[in-house]
Amino acid sequence: ISDELSGCLKRLLKIAEDSDGAFDPTIGKLIRLWDIGGENQKIPEEAEIKNVLKDSGYQKIFLDGNTVHMEEGCSLDLGAAGKGIGCDLILKELETKKDVTAALMNLGGSSVMTYGSKPDGSSWNVAVTDPRAENEDDYLGVVALNGTEFLSTSGDYEKYFIENGVRYHHIMDPSTGYPAESGVTGVTVV
């Protein structure tokens, strides 16, 4: 794999280790089983969940320089870190462009990256979505970004389905195989 991907995987595995598996990039099969936001989203059978979880676990992937070794059946899903990885690559490229001194980039609505100072010297102002608002133009507040910064928001309101009055969202708990039950609707990080 490339140096960039190797570095990304190394950081993700460190986060997995530091979080004792609460974040785990090896839940690819689990993500595909639920398919939340996809055409085949469903509440899987308990046996199906147990079956895919046996192939998960950040300890099942090993990096040796730019070579990845995974136990048979293990499957990666980098969705939780994809936009952050993308921002790192964009920043690296922008730093090589002498004619680009400032930029504001929207990376899919839930992530925004600023580069350099805004030409008029003011802050880049980014609205944070109100997860339970009826009108998608409603927001909780505005975050002022200065210089090169990255803001990312995620929550149980982005990709989900409701069945029998229960909200099933895309943020999975690798220890249970079900959507995480933290009581938190959304989180924004700068």
Describe each region flagged by the PLM:
Residues 1-190:
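Mature catalytic core of soluble alpha/beta enzymes
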